[in-house]
């Protein structure tokens, strides 16, 4: 059963996340988080190290402040959805007690009543390799894993991910908006991989047995 837990403040919400796998953590479990590998995340989960505080990083501040505006514009662009946001809360599923989902927004498809996930990303391009992450029809691997984790926890039917991609050239700012739609029915096999990987990882946490390092593909 999926339940929603509401918190009185952001510090209380942050405290409740400890000991559980969140969306961005899921990519670390699978070795697909470019900022943290699976061993580093394991060290955090067993208390050897503390997560780095990135709340004052400029890109985090920008993304946090831009989120509500991007969500509002998405709602204007997609009248077929009811768009809702629940702050300082998390969704929990008793099938996966090791996981939580804190969403940028929740969608209801008005014609069918289907429930979906809204995920917002802001990204600034700094070079050709960074640009390649957002080229084509696929989202970066770590964000793909994140939204599949959310599908696992919520049992919702689809994801709408909106990315605002920013580039600065000669003091001129260019913004590109890209929308990505993912149907749960198309990614069930990948969700099963995430379920299995997260369960195995949490067993290693309980046993305090360090996992083998997963190296990124070259």
Where are these regions (language model features)?
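Charged, glycine-rich intrinsically disordered N-terminal tails and low-complexity linkers that flank
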Residues: 1-65
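Nucleic-acid nuclease catalytic cores
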Residues: 77-103, 107-205
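Generic structural marker for isolated residues within well-ordered, non-membrane alpha-helices
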Residues: 39, 71, 147
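Acidic-basic catalytic patches of nuclease active cores, encompassing PD-(D/E)XK
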Residues: 60-85
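Helix-loop elements that line ligand-binding/catalytic pockets
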Residues: 198-218
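Short glycine-rich, polar/acidic loop-and-turn segments at beta strand-coil junctions
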Residues: 46-48, 66-68, 72, 87-89, ...
């Amino acid at each position: 059963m999926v339940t929603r837990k509401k918190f009185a403040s952001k510090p209380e919400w942050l405290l409740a996340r400890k000991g559980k796998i969140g969306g961005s953590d899921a990519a670390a479990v699978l070795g697909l988080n470019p900022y943290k590998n699976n061993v580093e995340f394991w060290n955090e989960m067993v208390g050897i190290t503390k997560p780095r505080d990135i709340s004052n990083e400029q890109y985090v501040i920008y993304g946090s402040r831009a989120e509500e505006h991007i969500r509002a514009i998405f709602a204007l662009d997609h009248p077929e959805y009811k768009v809702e946001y629940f702050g300082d809360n998390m969704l929990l599923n008793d099938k996966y007690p090791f996981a939580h989902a804190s969403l940028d927004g929740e969608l209801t498809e008005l014609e069918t009543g289907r429930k979906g996930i809204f995920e917002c990303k802001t990204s600034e391009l700094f070079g050709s390799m960074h640009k390649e992450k957002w080229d084509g029809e696929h989202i970066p691997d770590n964000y793909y894993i994140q939204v599949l984790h959310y599908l696992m926890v919520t049992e919702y039917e689809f994801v709408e991910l909106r990315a605002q991609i920013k580039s600065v050239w000669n003091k001129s700012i260019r913004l590109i908006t890209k929308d990505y739609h993912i149907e749960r029915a198309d990614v069930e096999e990948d969700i099963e991989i995430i379920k299995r990987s997260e369960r195995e990882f949490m067993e290693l946490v309980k046993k305090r047995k360090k996992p083998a390092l997963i190296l990124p593909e070259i």
